[in-house]
């Protein structure tokens, strides 16, 4: 029987002790003496959120299919346990073996959201691993990061030994083999890092040098070693049926996770070209999984987990070419078990009424759509590809299908935005409310219509056409939200429209971290040392701490947030080849200013650069 790292009296003191004990259904147990590599896979947030991360579960399953690797999980301890661990000098441990992280060969950290960066430092701190990679010794675990935020790893470069860029299914096999070979040959930590840097998709920050101009922009970025490539190319799998790691028995959490269901990934990438969307660019090309493969996976995962809900995961579920077939299958196959079907990421113009009605037969819920902008002009700027007619027609079809609750997501602070664009959010919500009363006869209405409008504030992200765009100050974002709020109050159906908005200070900090360079690491470290932690949680976020950190380090946040970049400027992430070319992104930036729409990947090739992968959904690749 395993000995838990935490004593019973500690477990009784803390909130949700089940976060830390492991032993869940489908957790993988091995004998540590029988493996060559021990990999601690960390998520820099609480257990419930990390256990909902599909990428982490796929890699956990894939690594453990290797006989020579034992992958174990860990998550950020909540503040109550964090305090006790520091007071009693208890080292951070993994769930499976309950062993200290310090004993492992690798510490892998998922980087999905910039506001978790101080939690990355918490993981290192509680593990007893030096913050800076340059200060680590031979026996310290190699710290590796991956995920969407790794497409600009520079703000964290000082803290990581290496990053993987792209999809982990392709990278880690070669990395593990190189580690074993280096260990067998008696090579040093530095020997391994040099070999790792030559594996496609692996970035070792210490092997690259950055210089800066007097104005603060980057002067040069180059590798220090002849064998280390100047460009790091993202890695991906093209055949989602042959090369995809089929997840059959995901770990079932002890406590309710944020996404407490089976997640069925139906495709990767997105055929649309929304100019604000990083995921839509970095995960190109779109690659679909075959519907027969999905049917088999659904049966197996539901059987092995006991979950009562299955979610179809993708960036745009409506664009999956076999959506109706898989939805019909899931509803018919699992009707007796009352399995609920969740369809996130739907486009309002592509949501078929027959599919919608069948999903509703199982369980009624509100529908979520994301027009993103209130006016047609601004939707053209961001390349949303939706007309007002599309939106109202789609909402009408939804109302006819029995829904009376709709969630609408918009962004404020988009490039070229005017006051009319902001007020357009209220006007569109009003028109959707009117549509409900127009298309649904009074005797068929399930109460009043409820329109929930939510606005976030725009954050420019790397590898998007808007990566050069300026942001706004917090007070400017608040004024924009007030414009929308006041306009909603003036609408005829104002009582049917609820409005909320994201906190602007979090947005500004996210913008700083998203487009930061290596100089930003000292701000992150200083903020952590002053008490910043769980910045993604509104109840824990302390912007005053960050302001002090900027002041004490002498870093000007507005240099990173308010400044429009020149397209000639060397950007911190330019050394990464993410598939989409800079030439394409510049062209799309210009198209945005011209309010011109670019067709999606099934309509016409936009010349984005991903043809080189020779696969996926691309009209040109089939010629």
Task: Give, region by region, the residue ranges found by the protein language model.
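Radical SAM enzyme core and accessory elements
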Residues: 1-28, 33, 39-41, 490-623
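N-terminal [4Fe-4S]-dependent radical SAM core
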Residues: 10-40, 47-48, 205, 211-263, ...
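Low-complexity, highly charged intrinsically disordered N-terminal segments
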Residues: 39-44, 50-72, 77-85, 89, ...
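N-terminal pre-triad scaffold of radical SAM enzymes
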Residues: 41-45, 63, 251-278, 302, ...
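Conserved SAM/AdoMet-binding glycine-rich loop
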Residues: 41-46, 115, 299-407, 412-452, ...
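Flexible loop/turn segments at secondary-structure boundaries
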Residues: 47-50, 79-82, 115-117, 150-153, ...
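Canonical Radical SAM [4Fe-4S] cluster-binding loop centered on the CxxxCxxC motif
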Residues: 53, 255-292, 607-622
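Glycine-rich beta-alpha loop elements in corrinoid/cobalamin-binding modules
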Residues: 76-222, 465-517, 524-539
């Amino acid at each position: 029987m395993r000995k838990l790292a935490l004593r019973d009296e500690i477990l009784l003191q803390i909130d949700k002790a089940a976060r830390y004990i492991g032993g869940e259904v489908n957790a993988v147990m091995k004998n540590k003496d029988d493996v060559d590599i021990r990999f601690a896979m960390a998520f820099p947030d609480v257990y419930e959120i990390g256990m909902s991360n599909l990428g982490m579960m796929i890699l956990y399953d894939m690594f453990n299919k290797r006989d020579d690797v034992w992958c174990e999980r860990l998550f950020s301890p909540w503040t109550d346990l964090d305090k006790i661990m520091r007071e009693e000098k208890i080292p951070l441990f993994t769930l499976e073996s309950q062993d200290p992280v310090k004993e492992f060969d690798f510490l892998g950290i998922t980087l999905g959201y910039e506001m978790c960066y101080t939690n990355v430092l918490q993981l290192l701190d509680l593990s007893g691993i030096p913050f800076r990679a340059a200060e680590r010794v031979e026996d310290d675990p190699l710290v590796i990061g991956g995920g969407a935020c790794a497409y600009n790893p520079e703000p964290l470069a000082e803290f990581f030994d290496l990053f993987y860029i792209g999809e982990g299914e392709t990278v880690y096999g070669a990395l593990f083999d190189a580690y074993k070979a280096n260990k067998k040959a008696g090579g040093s930590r530095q020997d391994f890092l040099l070999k790792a840097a030559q594996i496609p998709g692996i970035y070792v920050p210490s092997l690259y040098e950055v210089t800066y101009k007097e104005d603060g922009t980057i002067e040069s970025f180059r590798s220090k070693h002849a064998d280390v490539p100047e460009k790091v190319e993202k890695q991906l799998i093209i055949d989602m049926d042959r090369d995809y790691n089929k997840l059959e028995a995901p770990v079932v959490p002890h406590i309710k996770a944020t996404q407490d269901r089976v997640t069925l990934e139906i495709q990767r990438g997105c055929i649309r070209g929304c100019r604000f969307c990083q995921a839509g660019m970095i995960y190109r090309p779109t690659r679909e999984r075959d519907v027969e493969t999905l049917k088999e996976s659904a049966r197996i995962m539901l059987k092995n987990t006991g979950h009562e809900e299955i979610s179809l995961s993708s960036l745009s579920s409506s664009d999956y070419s076999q959506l109706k077939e898989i939805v019909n299958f899931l509803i018919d196959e699992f009707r007796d078990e009352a399995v609920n079907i969740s369809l996130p990421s739907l486009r309002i113009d592509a949501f078929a009424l027959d599919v919608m009605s069948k999903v509703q037969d199982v369980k009624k819920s509100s529908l979520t759509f994301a027009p993103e902008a209130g006016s047609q002009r601004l939707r053209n700027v961001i390349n949303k590809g939706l007309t007002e007619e599309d939106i109202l027609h789609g909402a009408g079809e939804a109302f006819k299908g029995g829904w009376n609750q709709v969630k609408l997501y918009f962004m404020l602070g988009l490039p070229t935005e005017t006051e009319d664009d902001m007020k357009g959010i209220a006007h569109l919500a009003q028109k959707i409310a009117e549509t409900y009363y127009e298309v649904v006869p009074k005797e068929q209405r399930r109460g009043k219509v409820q329109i929930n409008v939510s606005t976030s504030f725009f954050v420019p992200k790397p590898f998007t056409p808007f990566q050069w765009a300026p942001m706004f100050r917090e007070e400017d974002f608040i004024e924009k939200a007030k414009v929308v709020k006041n306009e909603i109050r003036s609408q005829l159906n104002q009582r049917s429209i609820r409005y909320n908005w994201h906190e602007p200070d979090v947005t500004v900090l996210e913008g700083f971290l998203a487009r930061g360079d290596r100089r930003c690491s000292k701000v992150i470290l200083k903020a952590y040392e002053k008490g910043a932690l769980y910045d993604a949680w509104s109840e824990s976020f302390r912007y005053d701490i960050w302001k002090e950190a900027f002041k004490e380090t002498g870093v000007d946040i507005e240099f990173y947030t308010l400044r429009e970049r020149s397209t000639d400027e060397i950007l911190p992430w330019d050394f990464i080849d993410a598939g989409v070319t800079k030439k394409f992104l510049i062209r799309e930036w210009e198209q945005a200013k011209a309010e011109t729409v670019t067709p999606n990947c099934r309509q016409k090739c936009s010349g984005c650069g991903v043809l080189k992968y020779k696969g996926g959904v691309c009209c040109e690749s089939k010629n």
